[in-house]
């Protein structure tokens, strides 16, 4: 048995705070750190000193890019709980960083969704919400900025219902709004809470509910109790008998339904004005899961069978690396979530994805950007290790005697690329090192060298993503670089099936070369990827040459069919062929496979695919006509229009190629008042006139 822990596992919460860019997520996190006693002076984003945003660019741009993990402790607003440990993973809200969000959601157990009381549910909130649904993450909602002009709590609650298809259950109501926002009503305790402004909200007083709010409170309290009662027959019977439930029963019922993802308890406040954050921390403890409340993580055992690891110190050690960060003081930091077992500093771990054993140097518990060295980590913990060389994002690290590979994360393919070159000879070598490190940290960022032009090409999820990479090269690695024009990552595919022979024979004195194959090349569903099948019977092509044929096909796919872009979504089957006892070789069959694919694919109705982006524009009504006209000129397909407090929302699908420089154009169209978000949606066939122009340009 493992030795007793300082804080039992059921008193640990691994949470993320997710939100749209300006909903006030970083300020909320800051206040959490302040009230839990970690942070002695509150950081403000608009002064550029927030604790969580520790990369320089984040402080300049005021947006959060890297998900730092922070540990803090909470005893409750009235010191009513035993000590709980809360690990907070900061998630970015900008759409170019969806990969960061995916990563953090993968290792959290619960989340707090922060909404702006004025902007409500923004397009970005919808994206993150969908991602959280995919990982079945239980959530609380916090309607922030209740002190802002235009604040409206119930409107946001309705948007959570209508736009996010969630079931919001307010457990608080605001007292007043805008500059009259004074405090909140706790619907469970039936009390008003007023935070004391003199000590920055550290103390508060409980008071009776204001007369003019009693009817409203009664209405929402009943909805909340009904939601709690629906958690079990037992509670429902008690409610029907007594017409009420005790505070403990309400919390128990709400917790059960939150963990089952049936409801989202909603709270409100103003983080900036120090109102409501401690009550939010209490709700994290009351309603969000501990590692023991979530299902055991699944994975693949060493023998290929399905296995799992439950959150216990007594199980074999298994953890998932979810973030790699370069740190100026200690080198590479690997952030990981422990799912089972115990790891001590100095232990060796096994990485089944890379097939490598590594020794853990130091273990650090992170407080945003300061660090505390610890001796061990246990199931449910989140920590950072120093000194791991081969581990990349999404890898498993585990006990060597009990190998398991935890489910890998899926990372999106990059959709945009730019050529980049160092400004001076001295920068040349440093640039290679810098790009390598950045690619190790961020799986949605790729680097390769273009064979023809010998240029270094970097690829990513959007213009902002690549701008920040170039910016980090300059700051962290002192590399100055010139950046080319952004280029779109087109793809090619085929529309019909074909059978094609590829025969490679060279007989010129001495040993010749002989490879002969017949391939069937067929289109697959969009997004289905590449499949290679061996249907050879009777050994007409010996088995040892089959991998060479596949290799030849794959290499030719990288070179494209008509325009030199990678081919996707095809199935290739080798079904016939012949060989020569002496002259056949892997090389010959690789060339034969490559020839057959090149020849066959070019006759199979090849088409060019272009990335289509899902774009949402929010614009004041008076610019609506210009904005829509401009989107139509960009080959946009309008999918729908909606109203929001910030103006009209236009939902549109636009080819990425037409979106370069859109930020600047939109600013001038709307005098800086319209905003947009953009994320990759799918690849679709480019119209023939566009495709022809691109092919011509390529050749």
Swiss-Prot record:
Region of interest called Disordered, as start-end residue ranges on this chain: 292-312
InterPro entries xref list: EFG_II, EFG_III, EFG_III/V, EFG_IV, EFG_V, EFG_V-like, EFTu-like_2, G_TR_CS
Keywords tagged on the record: Cytoplasm, Elongation factor, GTP-binding, Nucleotide-binding, Protein biosynthesis
SUPFAM superfamilies: EF-G C-terminal domain-like, P-loop containing nucleoside triphosphate hydrolases, Ribosomal protein S5 domain 2-like, Translation proteins
CDD domains from the UniProt entry: EF-G, EFG_III, EFG_mtEFG1_IV, EFG_mtEFG_C, EFG_mtEFG_II
Keyword Heme (UniProt): no
Record GO terms (molecular function): GTP binding; GTPase activity; guanosine tetraphosphate binding; translation elongation factor activity
Record keyword Protein biosynthesis present: yes
Annotated localization: Cytoplasm
tr-type G domain location: 10-292
Cellular component, GO, one term: cytoplasm
Sites where the protein binds GTP: 19-26, 90-94, 144-147
GO terms for biological process, alphabetical: ribosome disassembly
Main location: cytoplasm
Job of this protein: Catalyzes the GTP-dependent ribosomal translocation step during translation elongation. During this step, the ribosome changes from the pre-translocational (PRE) to the post-translocational (POST) state as the newly formed A-site-bound peptidyl-tRNA and P-site-bound deacylated tRNA move to the P and E sites, respectively. Catalyzes the coordinated movement of the two tRNA molecules, the mRNA and conformational changes in the ribosome.
Family membership: Belongs to the TRAFAC class translation factor GTPase superfamily. Classic translation factor GTPase family. EF-G/EF-2 subfamily.
Name of the molecule in the record: Elongation factor G
Organism for this UniProt entry: Coxiella burnetii (strain CbuK_Q154)
